[in-house]
Amino acid sequence: NSEVGINYFDNTYRFRQDSTFLYFFGIDQPDLAAAIDIETGEEILFGNDVTIDDIIWMGPQPAMKDKGENAGVQIVKPLDALSAYISDAKNIGRKIHFLPPYRYHNKIQLNKLLGADIDRQKELASVEFIKGVVALRELKDSYEVAELDKAANIGYIMHYTAMQMAKTGMVEQELVGLMEGIA
């Protein structure tokens, strides 16, 4: 997923990473893509290191290679290498599996990468891939259950704090700030 502008490019809504991307790679950052080659077993993360302009605003950030390694991905390439990677796979007759996109930016990207008609992408999505993701995500191991419990507890604390702190005349954003501070 990429950031989405509210009224111009650099004034964005709060970023929310795609849940399936988070499930498989655990990296909550915009402008990333990944490929899992089921024939070779390779996992490839596509993303760019921050620029000096980014560092001025955000401070030093881990390199993409380090983020990939933390996610268990050994191969990391710049985002603009994705197009050549997909093109090479298509040229040797490999089937490209993808999940149904729900954001327009991703639909446009799929159109550019695969030539998939935007209006037909839902039906062109890989049923095999969808079923595989569902099979993985429907059963939880003890680690996943512990993470769900932790998230539920944080949500409880956030909402309970908001209820305790709410006062007449208070601006909603003040409560949102308190809740975000807990998260």
Protein language model regions, located:
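Active-site cores enriched in adjacent His and Asp/Glu residues with nearby glycine-rich loops
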Residues: 1-7, 149-183
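A composition/biophysics-driven feature that prefers long, compositionally simple stretches
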Residues: 1-157
